């Protein structure tokens, strides 16, 4: 028996009947099976080794192009989502490999400057959602247009991890919560370290139930979700847990994400993305030929794909190159 087959047998024995099983996963293009790795393990590895994943290390989480060494980036956020997700998946006997693959891919489509860049592209293009772009990357853009040929279960989880969308697997539903838990807790941790907020400013119920440290907050929310989702058909917290999560989120939007100290950089980041898009729409010959080919000649789509894939610093330097005067040695 192959190692992969043994792993698939172990899944059937050890995982919940409600879990997604690797052996049942489907791809749009069928492939020869790997002797060692399951389909979900291969998906995780393909994402991890992709160019789009590597670029996440230089993309904004909250603070645009931060100079400190310890602030979160889009990559560290992704890794924290994967860790929280795997912890909950193991407790619930769900498929950890599927959870990890979804986590690794869920933010591949994020723009430079985070949600500010996403809104900027939405403003100029009429429609742009980072979760949809994540799926476009793994289907159409990676591997010179061949994509990564991920399983439908992984792509479904990537697409449906945000907003009111609902994934078709429990693992996908789990990542939606893991994402929220991760970003609220680590963004609070970063904001406190920056001096933007202090623990005493947290809403009373948030402070009482979740505590005031990054660790205690994650622990409380993970325990709530696991206790309430055990052997259930949905992933959920209890009523109080969801209320506290929303209260914490509202606090973070008011005091951190939309706070006065971050507004100047948010406006600058938005402006950089808008002006780069306008530049390439007026100078389509300057777009990489590969990008135009992948977009099948649609210049707006090519510009959107190209700009959304830029890192923060690359976007800033590109903006300077296109719009700022150059110094000449005379």
Regions found by a protein language model. Give the residues of each.
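Histidine-centered, transition-metal-coordinating active-site segments
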Residues: 1-78, 82-88, 95-96, 128-330
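Short glycine-enriched loops at secondary-structure junctions
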Residues: 53, 105-107
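Amphipathic alpha-helical interaction segments
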Residues: 92, 111-115, 314
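Short active-site segment of divalent metal-dependent hydrolases/proteases
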Residues: 109-110, 182
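Conserved short loop/turn motifs at secondary-structure junctions
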Residues: 104-105, 122, 293
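Post-HEXXH active-site segment of zinc metalloproteases
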Residues: 97, 101, 112-127, 193-197
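Short strand->helix junction
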Residues: 71, 110-111
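Short alpha-helix carrying the canonical HExxH Zn2+-binding catalytic motif
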Residues: 100-105, 177-178
